[in-house]
Each structure stands twice: as structure tokens, then as C-alpha cells.
Amino acid sequence: MIILALDPGRNKTGFAFVDFDGRLLASGIFLTDEREKFFDELESSSPKFLSWLKEGSTENFNEPVSLIIIGNGTTSDEFSLYVQERASCEIISVDEKNTTLEARELYWKIHRPGLITRLLPEGLRVPKRTLDDLAAWAVALRGLKKYRDIRRNRL
């Protein structure tokens, strides 16, 4: 099961592909104005997302996305409507409050800080890139919890 999480913003959108256990498979960032191009790529027979990838790889994607999780921030209403028009799978939205802070923690889990950086308090460590994709991963982790709760309550 491949899950796509999206953290839409005014100018750029973070995306993360995760498995059902929440493990990051691939993530990246695209300009929000390029959402049509992103979904065209998603619907292609072998999506690569190469120009947008920041982490991981889509090389071994051999199944379609079965769940989309969207962060419900500032620009999410219009974005969610667009996704509903394009997607053929279940879509859920989650609160994205503080996902940027969680993204910093996730960044340092993937990219262990060097010795000198480790000496700094976590709040003073500055990642070497923007983290919109990892905020989408944080959205995915929240969304998976919500999805499991919904499924459990249906039983």
C-alpha cells in the first residue's frame, strides 16, 4: 500500500510517499502552480518525480497510490478540491499544526548531524534545505493514525 501525503502551501507543496507503516519511500517539493504536472506524473505508468525529489526514490513503485492524506492548512481548501477531482482513491485531511517543527526532527533522523552540530541545542540546528516534503511526511504519520482509527471504528 502506497500512501501520498501532501502539505500544500501558497508557493510550494511538499509531498511524501510512505508505506502503511509510515516509512518514508520518497519525498519532494513542487511549486503549487505545477500541481497539474505533478498529478499527470502521478497518473503516468511509471512515475519518477525526479525533478522534485529530495529524499528516497520512486524506482520500485509497482502499485498505485491507495490513500491520499492532505494537511488542512492555509491553502488546503482549493488544493483539496483539485485533488478530489484528480484522485481515484480515498482522501483524508488532517491538522497540519506544528508539522514544520516535526519536519525538523524528521530531517535530523535522516541526516544525522555532525559532531559539532550535535553539540548545538536542537532548536539551534539549521537544516541545509527547505523541509516542506518532510512536513508532508509528518502529515502522513498523523493521517495514518487517523485512518487506522477510522477503520477500527467501522469494524
Task: Indicate residue ranges for each PLM-predicted region.
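Phosphate- and other anionic-substrate recognition elements at nucleic-acid/protein interfaces
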Residues: M1-L6, R10-L155
